[in-house]
């Protein structure tokens, strides 16, 4: 019982090849309470055991980092167990496993025929012509360098300025152009969406003004309610589909939409006429005929070059005709008057009245000023829904 036994063992400490199986007995000094060196001496008397010298080094253990009891006892009577700390030099790893640190030498570049075989197909003339391209020179030659073929060695210390100005790859796309290319459409889309939302409120505002004419001095209430389709009190501009006034609301808004489209069409025609794109040639003073072609066919204007469009006066003679520069609004008004007078003969009876009205121009201006002063606030409430259309008209006037 007192010697070493080689029969199989069971339980803790079966693997005898593992040094110090319990993990905290550096010198294998078991306490007598455990029956050391008596009934179970297998570990202390095993001649094949690994003495494991690293177990004598004090380190992080069960008692915390670097904690050593002040006396022996459970850790034995080694110097470390007595609280005597010894500095143990760290054994460096073998050279075979040591990692190489620092910058590795740059490998030798492969020959041009291997890295760029397509370049070998160029002749010397084409190759040198390609090198003259500023984009190619910027890739391979430093700023201010020469193309003599002599390559200066790179300095040991990289300059901050040269690292910024040097180009190591393909030219970077100008981010300012990319930003402006994205911001432009986004701003146009945002402005268009804002104007669209404002324009969509025009029919509702005009519908409210239209229905308010029937309720002077009172709040507008839908008159389409009856016993057959009882609905709650609501405004005539927001009738539900079950209300009999719903069809009238749709009809009013349809008429308002047609009026808005007609207004936009008139503005577009006036704009095109101002640009000289419409064959609008009114009656010429002292003549009863109009020209048959657009104003652009005129070759001899009456008053030289003018920024205003010129309209033809008579049929061309010898390839030339007489043209007069006139305001676009006057030309368009004359065109509409001629078109209407041909189809409605009774309009010719209004000509004397119009001439008399034009002759009273000072009185007309004073009357217009007085009416605007008197009806200005009420007219502003009528014109206010059309204010969002003004930016659109301005953009069309500028860019068309």
From Swiss-Prot:
Systematic vaccination of individuals at risk of exposure to the virus has been the main method of controlling the morbidity and mortality associated with hepatitis B. The first hepatitis B vaccine was manufactured by the purification and inactivation of HBsAg obtained from the plasma of chronic hepatitis B virus carriers. The vaccine is now produced by recombinant DNA techniques and expression of the S isoform in yeast cells. The pre-S region do not seem to induce strong enough antigenic response. GO terms for biological process: caveolin-mediated endocytosis of virus by host cell; fusion of virus membrane with host endosome membrane; virion attachment to host cell. Residues 120-174 are annotated as: Pre-S2. Residues 1-20, 88-115 are annotated as: Disordered. Residues 88-106 have a biased composition (Polar residues). A lipid is attached at residue 2 (N-myristoyl glycine). Isoform M is N-terminally acetylated by host at a ratio of 90%, and N-glycosylated by host at the pre-S2 region. It comes from the Viruses. Residues 2-253, 203-253, 370-375 are intravirion. The keyword Acetylation applies. Residues 2-174 are annotated as: Pre-S. The keyword Transmembrane applies. The chain crosses the membrane at residues 182-202, 254-274, 349-369, 376-398. Glycans are attached at residue 320. InterPro entries: HBV_HBSAG. Residues 2-181, 275-348, 399-400 are virion surface. One of its GO terms (cellular component) is membrane. The large envelope protein is synthesized with the pre-S region at the cytosolic side of the endoplasmic reticulum and, hence will be within the virion after budding. Therefore the pre-S region is not N-glycosylated. Later a post-translational translocation of N-terminal pre-S and TM1 domains occur in about 50% of proteins at the virion surface. These molecules change their topology by an unknown mechanism, resulting in exposure of pre-S region at virion surface. The large envelope protein exists in two topological conformations, one which is termed 'external' or Le-HBsAg and the other 'internal' or Li-HBsAg. In its external conformation the protein attaches the virus to cell receptors and thereby initiating infection. This interaction determines the species specificity and liver tropism. This attachment induces virion internalization predominantly through caveolin-mediated endocytosis. The large envelope protein also assures fusion between virion membrane and endosomal membrane. The middle envelope protein plays an important role in the budding of the virion. It is involved in the induction of budding in a nucleocapsid independent way. In this process the majority of envelope proteins bud to form subviral lipoprotein particles of 22 nm of diameter that do not contain a nucleocapsid. This is Large envelope protein. It comes from Hepatitis B virus genotype A2 (isolate Japan/11D11HCCW/1998) (HBV-A).
């Amino acid at each position: 019982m007192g010697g070493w036994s080689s029969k199989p063992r069971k339980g803790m400490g079966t693997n005898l090849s593992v040094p110090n199986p319990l993990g905290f007995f550096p010198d294998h000094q078991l306490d007598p309470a455990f029956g050391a060196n008596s009934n179970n001496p297998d570990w202390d008397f095993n001649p094949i055991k690994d003495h494991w010298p690293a177990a004598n080094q004090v380190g992080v253990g069960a008692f915390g980092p670097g904690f050593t009891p002040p006396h022996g006892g459970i850790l034995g009577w080694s110097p470390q167990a007595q609280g005597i700390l010894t500095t143990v030099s760290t054994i460096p790893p073998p050279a075979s496993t040591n990692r190489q640190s620092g910058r590795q030498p740059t490998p030798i570049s492969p020959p041009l025929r291997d890295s760029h075989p397509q370049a070998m197909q160029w002749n010397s003339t084409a190759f040198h012509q390609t090198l003259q391209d500023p984009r190619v020179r910027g890739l391979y030659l430093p700023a201010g360098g020469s193309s003599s073929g002599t390559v200066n060695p790179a300095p040991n210390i990289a300059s901050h300025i040269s690292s910024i100005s040097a180009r190591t790859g393909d030219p970077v796309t100008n981010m300012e152009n990319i930003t402006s290319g994205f911001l432009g459409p986004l701003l146009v889309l945002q402005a268009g969406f804002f104007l669209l939302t404002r324009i969509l409120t025009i029919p509702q505002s005009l519908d409210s003004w239209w229905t308010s004419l029937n309720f002077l001095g009172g709040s507008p209430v839908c008159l389409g309610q009856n016993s057959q389709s009882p609905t709650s009190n609501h405004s005539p501009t927001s009738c539900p589909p079950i209300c009999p006034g719903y069809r009238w609301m749709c009809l009013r808004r349809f008429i308002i939409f047609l009026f808005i489209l007609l207004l936009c069409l008139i503005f577009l025609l006036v704009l095109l006429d101002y640009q000289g794109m419409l064959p609008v040639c009114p009656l010429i003073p002292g003549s009863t005929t109009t020209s048959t072609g657009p104003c652009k066919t005129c070759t001899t204007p009456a008053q030289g070059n003018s920024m205003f469009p010129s309209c033809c006066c008579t049929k061309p003679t010898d390839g030339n005709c007489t043209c007069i520069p006139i305001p676009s609004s006057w030309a368009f008004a004359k065109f509409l008057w001629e078109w209407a007078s041909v189809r409605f003969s009774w309009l010719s009876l209004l000509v004397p009245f119009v001439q008399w009205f034009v002759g009273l121009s000072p009185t007309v201006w004073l009357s217009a000023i007085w009416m605007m002063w008197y009806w200005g606030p009420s007219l502003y409430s009528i014109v206010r829904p059309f204010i969002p259309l003004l930016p659109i008209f301005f953009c069309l006037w500028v860019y068309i």
